[in-house]
């Protein structure tokens, strides 16, 4: 598998920070590793590496020096995969995962088909009512849909 271009990886990290899918420490470690191995890495990596991992706003701004503002379809798929991994691993509750999906749909440009799918999943969960049989079925549909996307996050989450 070919390495992910720096701009794509930075776009993933930027959006993942916004959605709460990653911590700043992970992003700073990545920038440090890129600087250590690639003498021709874009200068923006120095700004990312020098940013406090706790200052997510500044970190996201620094990542913009490496990537564009619009996330590619591959980045969006990876974000969904990362959300699915967190849900499957128990790092995020179902309710919080639905909030992440809502934020993704509202804040990140997604294609029409994905927008419609996210909207349908959200409406199904909202209409089903908590603690009912239909709610369990709606939750299961979301879990299965996200599980199918988990591998899309692999290369982005394993970037060094």
Please report, for each region that a protein language model flagged, where it lies by residue.
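Acidic, Ser/Pro/Thr-rich low-complexity regulatory regions
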Residues: 1-160
């Amino acid at each position: 598998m070919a390495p992910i271009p720096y701009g794509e990886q930075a776009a993933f990290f930027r959006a993942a920070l916004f959605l709460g899918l990653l911590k700043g420490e992970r992003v700073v470690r990545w920038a440090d590793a890129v600087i250590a191995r690639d003498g021709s890495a874009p200068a923006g990596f120095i700004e990312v590496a020098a940013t406090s991992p706790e200052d997510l706003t500044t970190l996201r701004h620094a990542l913009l020096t490496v990537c564009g503002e619009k996330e590619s379809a591959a980045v969006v798929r990876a974000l969904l995969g990362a959300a699915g991994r967190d849900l499957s691993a128990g790092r995020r509750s179902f309710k919080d995962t639905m909030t992440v999906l809502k934020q993704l749909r509202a804040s990140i440009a997604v294609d029409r088909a994905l927008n419609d799918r996210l909207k349908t999943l959200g409406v199904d969960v909202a209409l089903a009512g908590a603690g009912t049989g239909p709610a369990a079925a709606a939750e299961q549909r979301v879990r299965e849909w996200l599980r199918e996307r988990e591998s899309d996050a692999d290369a982005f989450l394993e970037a060094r």
